[in-house]
């Protein structure tokens, strides 16, 4: 990575305003509320998966297709870690054959999201229980993901057929979260090519998806014939020049995951710059609008982006020395976001929704999942709970 990025000065806040004892009790109450919902959904879903987003508060039931199915077993693994109750492990393990079948038969696998899909379903199972079949499924997923790596452009193509001119050479900020599958595969097999591809992609994302002011494009196109940069645009943000909140959150968290696997401290500083841009554009309740350009408007919030960003901030705190000048600020803001999500966005038992974290946005432009629960929002809220309640080792 060679690009220089501006790091904004942080807006002033008063530190130590969150009552940690009170927050701890709130999080225990939240976990009780969450697990009651999970218990109902385990029965309601059977062998199906929740769709990407609720429709009028109800999860569409789907087969193991699309990019989000692993967020459900990911929630179950987190619930097992936090409660020790066997029913969550058993429910998560029931989905493992479906993920094995999906990758073996190439069912809806023409996507970079194999990292999401197999980190949270199979690597989690292997890390927590030593399940060898889950490990093999994840290794096969890494091999399939390598098929999407273009060595000339040095990127993993996000979506679609590799020969589709509309998709060729397109990388997106979300992919930073998929790279740990490749780093892990190198660690497991001793084959460096997986990690080399992941490192190359992370470098290209840092150089081209991140703008000089530390905002991010959602997507960026590279020339697959020459390797030269072409242009950036959005797919889910407000405009090509705005900053989609969830994308910025993926960046904060995702660059840190590359640091965790490579030790490249440039990734920590890049995450810091993205975090400053994000934190400086939060409304009064610390939960972002769906696009950061919409601060000061009545645009809907995206609680899922807030949960992702809070997890990323806690990962940033872990990566920094104790005496870092802004470390306490990042931790304070992660706690404030967690408090706001718990008080204002987490569904209550009597709320007419099957989801957990309300007021998320999937795709504003298509009207899909607007002001609904989204499966990744539910997952990252649980991950946030796990990070704040105990020593927790990521599945990424």
Please annotate each region the language model reported:
Residues 1-396:
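Glycan-recognition and catalytic cores of secretory/periplasmic carbohydrate-active enzymes
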């Amino acid at each position: 990575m060679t690009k220089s990025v501006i790091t904004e000065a942080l807006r002033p806040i008063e530190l130590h305003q969150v009552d940690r004892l009170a927050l701890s009790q709130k999080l225990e109450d939240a976990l009780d509320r969450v697990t009651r919902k999970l218990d109902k959904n385990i029965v309601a879903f059977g062998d199906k998966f929740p769709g990407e987003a609720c429709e009028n508060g109800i999860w569409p039931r789907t087969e193991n297709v699309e990019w989000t199915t692993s967020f459900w077993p990911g929630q179950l693994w987190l619930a097992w870690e936090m409660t020790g109750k066997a029913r969550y492990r058993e429910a998560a393990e029931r989905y493992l054959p479906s993920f094995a079948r999906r990758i073996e038969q190439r069912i809806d696998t023409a996507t970079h999201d194999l990292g999401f899909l197999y980190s949270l379903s199979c690597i989690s199972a292997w890390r927590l229980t030593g399940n060898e079949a889950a490990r093999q499924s994840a290794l096969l997923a890494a091999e399939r993901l390598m098929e999407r790596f273009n060595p000339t452009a040095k990127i993993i193509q996000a979506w679609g057929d590799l020969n589709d001119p509309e998709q060729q050479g397109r990388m997106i900020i979300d992919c930073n979260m998929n790279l740990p599958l490749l780093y892990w595969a190198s660690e497991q097999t001793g084959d460096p090519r997986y990690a080399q591809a992941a490192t190359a992609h992370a470098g290209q994302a840092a150089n081209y998806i991140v703008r000089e002011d530390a905002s991010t494009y959602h997507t960026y196109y590279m020339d697959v014939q020459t390797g030269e940069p072409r242009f950036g645009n959005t797919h889910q943000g407000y405009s090509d020049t705005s900053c989609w909140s969830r994308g910025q959150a993926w960046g904060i968290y995702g660059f840190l995951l590359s640091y965790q696997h490579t030790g490249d401290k440039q990734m920590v500083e890049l995450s810091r710059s993205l975090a400053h841009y994000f934190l400086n554009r939060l409304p009064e309740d610390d939960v972002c609008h769906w696009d950061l350009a919409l601060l000061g408007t009545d645009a809907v919030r995206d609680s899922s982006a807030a949960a992702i960003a809070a997890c990323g901030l806690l990962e940033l705190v872990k990566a920094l020395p104790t005496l870092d000048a802004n470390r306490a600020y990042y931790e304070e803001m992660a706690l404030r976001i967690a408090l706001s999500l718990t008080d204002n966005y987490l569904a209550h038992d009597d709320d007419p929704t099957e989801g957990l974290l309300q007021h998320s946005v999937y795709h504003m432009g298509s009207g899909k999942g607007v002001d609904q629960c989204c499966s990744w929002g539910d997952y990252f809220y649980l991950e946030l709970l796990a990070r704040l309640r105990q020593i927790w080792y990521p599945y990424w």
